[in-house]
Curated annotation (Swiss-Prot):
Gene Ontology process terms (BP): cobalamin biosynthetic process
This protein's UniProt keywords: Cobalamin biosynthesis, Glutamine amidotransferase
SUPFAM superfamilies: Class I glutamine amidotransferase-like, P-loop containing nucleoside triphosphate hydrolases
Molecular-function GO terms, alphabetical: ABC-type vitamin B12 transporter activity; catalytic activity
Superkingdom, taxonomy of origin: Archaea
Catalytic site: 353 (nucleophile), 452
Function: Catalyzes amidations at positions B, D, E, and G on adenosylcobyrinic A,C-diamide. NH(2) groups are provided by glutamine, and one molecule of ATP is hydrogenolyzed for each amidation.
Protein name in the entry: Probable cobyric acid synthase
Sequence intervals crossing the membrane: none
Pathway stated in the Swiss-Prot or TrEMBL entry: Cofactor biosynthesis; adenosylcobalamin biosynthesis
Domain GATase cobBQ-type: 275-460
Matching Pfam families: CbiA (PF01656), GATase_3 (PF07685)
Amino acid sequence: MTAGEDCRTILVAGTASHVGKSTVAAGLCRLLADRGLSVAPFKAQNMSNNARAVPVADGAPPAADPWGEIGVSQYVQARAARTAASTDHNPVLLKPRGDAESQLVVDGRAVGHYSAGSYYESHWADARDAAAAAHARLAADNDVVVAEGAGSIAELNLHDRDLANLETARFADATILLVVDIERGGAFASLHGTLALLPDDIRDRVAGAVITKFRGDRSLLDPGITEIEARTGVPVLGVIPHDDPGLPAEDSVSLPDPSERVVDGGQDGVPDAASVTVAVPHLPHISNFTDLAPLARTPGVRVAYQPLDAPLAAADAVVLPGTKNTVDDLRAAREAGLGRALRAFDGPIVGLCGGYQMLGDRITDAATESTADDLGAVDGVGVLPVETAFQPDKRVEAVTRELADCGALGGATGAVTGYEIHMGRTTVPDGVPQPVGPASAARGRVLGTYLHGLFGNDAARRGFRDAVFAAAGVEQPAPADTPDQSPSDAAAALVDAHVDLDPLGVPPAPDA
């Protein structure tokens, strides 16, 4: 079989959000790639503030900038598929910056900010064309495209404009694998109702369903599976146990409510008394919180997402994360007293992207970023001597930086890699240390940088860990054992062990 000939598209759709679509899709990508097939992930339209810088795809509309952005999940799935990520893997990205407005990104490039009504009325048709063209390019070069849907495939109010689900199924001629989560209860009712609400042409594409997040004795499900198959005519192709492979979360659905304090980490066997806590103020428009995942996996480190008005007294360090709306979130943080708390905090503080901008003295041209159009300038937290001006053009690029000694990173040095996605331009006065390359800044215990993925680098993560443990006066635990499997391999093992792929029409391996 030659790549591109009779390419099969499998659409991993769901009965709801957060049912495990991304995990199943990533598992399929790795499993099929390891069988010798050329595989590409795809999500026609994603809504997420977790984004990643990738090259603009060959064949995409030309642009001066060779870099664009896609959702983090599609980047992870591309790595799972053992292929280089590009903008074709997620051609339409919506990045919310308020309750009624999102930034539209098409083929990796920011187009503008629109309300839902404006997007659907004036831009959706072009977005659909871009998505269909991106899929066609992927299908021409691969044996299998593993497409991921969004939310529920049965949203009746969206059936005439559901780009990630119904439209993808149609223009990709996709076979659908329907994912239903049993952990929240009502799995059989959800599956039956979803199938009943699908248009006939879409329902006919459903090859089977898979139940995720199951705990307990698998055989206890058998009577329900037998009946749901009889009622719907759709086979249940597998039951995946509740076993998190450790893939990055796709969007804020996986985060706690902003009014709650929830700790990530703690599965390392290290007693809380021998651990340190990194507080992460839960900004209203938090973005790229996947930056914090490597810290939560570090032995002895607890990452605590907490309300803006929660005290920092129990924290040993603070990371102020990225945000899709720096100005509005800064105003919310100041009103909650977070600015005063940060100025009084005596442990390490790291600001990432929007969090870095907030730590500075001042932000100008604020209306470019805020949902309020009458702002000129706003004062920052004032713990870093920098100023940021927002501009209409966005910087998107994968970068390599050289670390220089700074307190917040425990004196770590060496090259680090990551990516930048931001519309602000930060001015750093002469004489202010820039330990993470141009436009970064440090003063005492505080560091600000635009580098997403900083803690994914061993040197930076270990340096920050060392600084936090030293500041807290806590002895570090012994290093943890390296996991036997990568998250992608773990996801593939779950799919391989628990899902029957034959009804999906997967092409045979090249040597089969």
